[in-house]
Amino acid sequence: MKWIISLLAILLITVLGWLPFRGTDVATLEPAETLYVYLNKETIYIETDGGWLGKGNTVDEAVADLKESSPGQVFLQTVDYLLLQMGSEELLPMLYSYLRSGCSVCSVKEKPDIEKASAYLRTHRPGMTLQHYRAGKKDIPILIMMEERAYLYE
């Protein structure tokens, strides 16, 4: 009986070894450092620092559109900074499942230059994270981008 089980185990391992393995090609990953999320009428827009844009009626639809529209595989677990357009705060709970809890959050009045905002936030990290927001802290810092300067009001 033991030899039959051993033979079946060897056969199973052999068959599984012949099946095609589909891994992820790291060259196709599109990691994002900064996301800009805004609501325009009834449509939610999500834009990455890589220039990819997704839109939809829900956050799930916008993320799915973002992933479909990029040439590679958008990887949102690398996002360090979330820029929310003022008035879009209700979208935060819907973003929890896509972003790390340590992702810094700040509000912006208008669309920023995402690359410049990322560079500024690397040296002036906001004190608000998704985890803080989830725990009840609701005062989101405001990032103001001017031509050559940026300010973070906490």
Regions found by a protein language model. Give the residues of each.
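Membrane-proximal alpha-helical signals and transmembrane carboxylates
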Residues: 1-154
